[in-house]
């Protein structure tokens, strides 16, 4: 392997000459052999956007030459596009400020820009990783800015569309099933009737509320720390840098990023991402409920509830021929469990900042992005391979409806709660129908039962 010598404030170190990173990245590789977690493409892209925007603004403010700006922008564009992803090798489990990954981006952009200019990698000429690429920045404000860029893009580009896709499919099912009457269940026990469409409308509403929750948290994610530098004072930045840089990032992404009004909060705390993670946890809880309902309703096919059928996607057992399992519900419930667990880590990280800097930044963004990705992919998979293929089993639905003792509730206004309860208990004890039980007890006639117990009149408000 051909190497070159890179330098930093600690001296010289050999680096694989085929790589664009420099001394600080190399030292991090030596010191943090921890797990397999690497920063995802979303964070690398965000750092590229940030470095490009900073160069544009620094040039606009007269702090960076036009030639240097062009070189940095060209190299940063390659980072943004993903062309240089292999040159970002660092573990998530590193310094809590993300300093090594910030320097990784500075070094890669510097060396690639030097190469574009026809220079020698590692020379730091004509583009210096600190003086030029990192101008008017500190890891303490760049890394949280990249965190917010990455999270905001993924919430907008992946999670919201995935939730909408699933919601729309459930809305179609709600309309399709609006006239199919079934027995309700509370406490896992029989309850009064509703329609299958009404049941599915609950899922639609959950998803609509969750989409609204994501949109409600976005304004706090749009607030950027850039311009705070080391502790929030803005040391070594132009007075206009923070606002202009946020505006440039907004232009690059098409999202309404703004400069955080208080940089001390933006560096020392990550309450906005803790809040975001809480929203993701809420979505996970909703999806857990929906996925569980679907697999219970489809259980069987002969010895379970079996009121709906779901697509048969793959064999379900290596020993039981013909078995098909609710695998999409299972992936979704596992994803939900993981997202809830991720939120615990984010909460601990968010609560553990000290004085002017939170040093759990990589942990926080790793888990937030992981939760967004898991929820997004899970919703798309569930919609494509399960939700859109759900069909009602009308025979089973009618069987359960007609067998339910809870239809007796319709008799309450006519014969009173106590007498209705007697009919239900007697029918259950003797294995008869409600109608037979009521007639036997002399509490109603056949005609009265037929007039009063009408499931189709029990699915909306009524005092008749």
Curated annotation (Swiss-Prot):
**Pfam families hit by this protein:** FumaraseC_C, Lyase_1
Subunit info? Answer: Homotetramer.
Other remarks in the entry: There are 2 substrate-binding sites: the catalytic A site, and the non-catalytic B site that may play a role in the transfer of substrate or product between the active site and the solvent. Alternatively, the B site may bind allosteric effectors.
Signal sequence region:
none
Q: In which pathway does it act?
A: Carbohydrate metabolism; tricarboxylic acid cycle; (S)-malate from fumarate: step 1/1
**Gene field:** fumC
Disulfide partners: none
What is the protein's name according to its record? Fumarate hydratase class II
The EC code for this enzyme is: 4.2.1.2
Which keywords appear in this protein's UniProt record, sorted alphabetically?
Cytoplasm, Lyase, Tricarboxylic acid cycle
Tree of life domain: Bacteria
According to its UniProt record, which residues of this chain constitute the active site?
Answer: 187, 317
Q: What species was this sequence derived from?
A: Leptospira interrogans serogroup Icterohaemorrhagiae serovar Lai (strain 56601)
């Amino acid at each position: 392997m051909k190497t070159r010598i890179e330098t930093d404030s600690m001296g010289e170190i050999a680096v694989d000459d085929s790589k664009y990173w420099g001394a600080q990245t190399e030292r991090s590789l030596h010191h943090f052999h921890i797990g397999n977690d690497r920063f995802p493409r979303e964070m690398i892209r965000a750092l590229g956007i940030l470095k490009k925007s900073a160069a544009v603004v620094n040039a606009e403010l007269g702090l960076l030459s036009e030639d240097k700006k062009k070189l940095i922008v060209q190299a940063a564009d390659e980072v943004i596009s993903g062309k240089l992803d292999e040159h970002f090798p660092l573990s998530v489990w590193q310094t809590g400020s993300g300093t090594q990954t910030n320097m990784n981006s500075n070094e890669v952009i510097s060396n690639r820009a030097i190469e574009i200019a026809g220079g020698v990698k590692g020379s730091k000429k004509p583009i210096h990783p600190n003086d030029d690429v990192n101008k008017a920045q500190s890891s303490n404000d760049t890394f949280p800015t990249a965190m917010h860029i990455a999270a905001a893009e993924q919430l907008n580009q992946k999670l919201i569309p995935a939730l909408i896709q699933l919601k729309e499919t459930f809305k179609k099912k709600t309309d399709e099933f609006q006239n199919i009457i079934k027995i309700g269940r509370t406490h896992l026990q029989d309850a009064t009737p509703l329609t299958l469409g009404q049941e599915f409308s609950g899922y639609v509403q959950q998803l609509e509320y969750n989409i609204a929750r994501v949109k409600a948290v976005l304004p706090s994610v749009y607030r950027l720390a850039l311009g705070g530098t080391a502790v929030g004072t803005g040391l070594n930045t132009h007075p206009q840098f923070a606002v202009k840089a946020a505006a440039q990032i907004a232009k690059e992404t098409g999202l309404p990023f703004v400069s955080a009004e208080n940089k001390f909060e933006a560096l020392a705390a990550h309450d906005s991402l803790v809040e975001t993670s809480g929203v993701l946890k809420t979505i996970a809880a909703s999806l857990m409920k929906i996925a569980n309902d679907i697999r219970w309703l489809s259980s069987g096919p002969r010895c379970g509830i079996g009121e709906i059928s779901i697509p048969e996607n793959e064999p379900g057992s290596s020993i039981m021929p013909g078995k098909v399992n609710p695998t999409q519900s299972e992936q979704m419930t596992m994803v939900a469990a993981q997202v809830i667990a991720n939120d615990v880590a984010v909460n601990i990280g968010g609560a553990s900042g000290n004085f002017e800097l939170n040093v759990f930044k990589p942990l926080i963004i790793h888990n937030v992005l992981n939760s967004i990705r898991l929820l997004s992919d899970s919703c798309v998979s569930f919609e494509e391979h399960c939700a859109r293929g759900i069909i009602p089993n009308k025979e089973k639905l009618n069987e359960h409806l007609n067998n339910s003792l809870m239809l007796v509730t319709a008799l309450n206004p006519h014969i009173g709660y106590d007498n209705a309860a007697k009919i239900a208990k007697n029918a259950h004890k003797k294995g008869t129908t409600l109608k037979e039980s009521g007639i036997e007890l002399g509490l109603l006639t056949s005609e009265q039962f037929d007039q009063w117990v009408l499931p189709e009149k029990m699915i909306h408000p009524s005092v008749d």
